[in-house]
Amino acid sequence: MKSDIWRQTPASVKLLYITSFIMNLGFYALIPYLTLHLTGSIGWTLAMAGLVLGVRQFSQQGFAFLGGMVADKFGYKSTMILGMSIRAIGFALFAFCTKEWHFFVAAILSGLGGSLFEPAGSAAYAVLTPDAIRKEVFAFRNVLQNVGVVGSQIVGTALASLDFYWLSLFAGALYATTAVVAFLFLPPIAATNTKQGIWSSFSHVLHDQFFLKYTIVLIGYYYLYMQTFLTIPQLVEDIMHNKTYVGIVLSTISLSVILLQMKIVEWLQSYKQRLILIGIGAMVMGIGLFLLMFANHLWLLMLDAFIFSLGTMISMPQIVDMVPRFAPKEHVAAYYGFNGYSLAIGGTVSQLFGGWIYDVGKNLDMQWLPWTLCLLVGMVVVWNLYRMEGKLEQQLSPSRVK
């Protein structure tokens, strides 16, 4: 981040950076090893372990709209602290689970915590950040997330080698720490929807037809994005016959974002057609995934992963910056929460249908099938966003966050 932008960044946003980094460190240190714990130490099937992860994701994304409406009504700071505290309890509970239902309770609590602090946190970033530097602020948050991913691999490996018990307590303690830090140092962020009931946000979002279409189109983007959690690791293992290389390929994506995200935002600063940029990013992601069908060496896998990461770096800052442009300031968290359905649906379809189509292609000796589908999805996303771009200005809320 440039020094002048850093100077313009409010102290409260810098504190949000700290809490975001700590939470990402805790999340990515625990979740990948939860699957290994369930299938290894506990002896569950992969399908059963996947069900626990699916319950956690649905508990978060499925209730994020409600969490956003609560944040708009009762304040962003208090909602964030409540969500962080609930997730801290959920993550710590994994250390004490001995029966199946214990794990599902811990997963639900973990997800519900996220459904509160995620939309409230995104709205806090948008409200506290001057409009002129909001894209850069969200881009730097994306960088910190990937720094957290890389750091969590080191921390998670070290603690998991001791015992999953300590890893769960560590992850829970990190979220508890962020709750305390936010309580002590984050300034009050007043509720923006003080004159209307919670359900006014519900009605307002559902009547915003352009935003609903935008959210639906983003399902395709997240279908592509979530390939990093299933089909890409599986392809790397199938080609290299060693799980170690999975970490190398995924780290290529994270390190690329860390090194290049801010520079790409700077290069695209003068390009004002934001929806088209999101579409171009999705198209680049689709191309990177499509090229995987030609990869037969580690360096080709890493090159395709780098191309894929370029697409995420083009799209992601624009995606998180678009929501406050649609939303009236009194409903911004509700808009963020509803927009999360694109991730919930796209991620679920990606992991279920994407995994199935990968197996079908493999069994029919049509390895090109899942990757060609990804290219087509990228084309559909860019075409729809290109058509929507011309109508964007008249759809932006006149009372949006400035």
Task: Please annotate each region the language model reported.
Residues A107-Q145:
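Cytoplasmic helix-loop-helix junction between adjacent transmembrane helices
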Residues Q61-T98:
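Conserved MFS/SLC helix-loop-helix module at the cytosolic interface between two early adjacent transmembrane helices
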Residues A160-A173, W356-V377:
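A membrane-interface helix-boundary motif in multi-pass transporters
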Residues Q57-F65, V149-V150, S254-M262, G347-T348:
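Residue-level signature of mid-helix packing/kink "hotspots" within the transmembrane helices
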Residues P32-A47, L230-Y245:
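Short amphipathic helix-loop junctions that connect adjacent transmembrane helices
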Residues M1-P10, P187-V217:
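Juxtamembrane intracellular "pre-TM" segments in multi-pass secondary transporters
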Residues H331-K362:
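A late C-terminal transmembrane helix in Major Facilitator Superfamily
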Residues A64-G75, L260-Q273, Y358:
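Helix-to-loop junctions at the C-terminal end of transmembrane segments
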